[in-house]
C-alpha cells in the first residue's frame, strides 16, 4: 500500500504564462542582517515543523516570526512577491496575484522579559485583513525597515497550493544504491483528475525537496511511465536521497534463542 511521503513533494504544474526573466534574483528564506535578526521561522501557526504550504482560499495562514536583538520597536514593512516555479519573480503584476497594499508595517510585536539579551519579537500572518492572495504559486515576502526600503532585512518564502492534481507517494529504503542502509528512494505518481496533461515532460514542473532544504532540490525530472489516469515517477536514480543516521531503520530483534 502506498502512503503519503513525509518527504515534501511539490508539483508545480500550474505556472502557466508566468514568464521567467534571466538574471533575476532567486528568492529563498534568508536573513540579510544576521547580526541583528535571529530565529526566523516560516510555518503554519501552531505547526512548527510543517512545510510552509497553504491551500488557496482555505483560510489557512502562514506565520512569519523573527527576533530583533534590540529592545525598541522598529517599523518593519513588507512586500509580497509572486514567484515562478524556480522562485524568481513571475510576470504577474500585483493586481493579478494579490488584493491589498504593499509596504504595510508589521505591528504585531512583543518585547522580551527577564532575558539575558533584550530583543523584540515580530510576527506577521499571511493572508490577513490587509493582504489577500488571489492565485496559487510560490510567494516571497521581503521585509525591510520603513525608512530604508532599499535594504532587505530578510526574505520569507512559502507556497499556496490548489488541488488540481493528486499525488500518491512513498519513501522506501530499498534503493538502486543500497537496501535499507544510507539512502532513501522517493516514488510518486501524479493523478491527473480532470486536468488535461498532454505532454507531462513539458506541462509539469516537478520539484522534490527533502525536509524543506533549498540546497538539494531535484528538478527536471522525467516520468518513468505515463498511464491514462496518472504520470508515474518510480525507481529514478535522481530521486535517491542520502538519509544518514536520522532516517535509518532499527531492528529490535534478539539474537538469543532457546536451544
Where in the sequence are the language-model features?
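Extended low-complexity, serine/threonine- and proline-enriched intrinsically disordered segments
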Residues: 72-100, 198-221
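Bacterial Sec-dependent N-terminal signal peptides
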Residues: 1-25
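Contiguous beta-strand segments within globular domains
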Residues: 33-82, 178-192
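Short beta-strand elements
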Residues: 149-169, 259
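Ligand-binding face of N-terminal immunoglobulin V-set domains in extracellular IgSF glycoproteins
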Residues: 118-146
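Low-complexity, Pro/Ser/Thr- and charge-rich linker/hinge segments at domain boundaries
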Residues: 26, 31, 160-183
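Short, aromatic- and glycine-rich surface loops/edge beta-strands on solvent-exposed regions
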Residues: 78-80, 137-144, 238-259
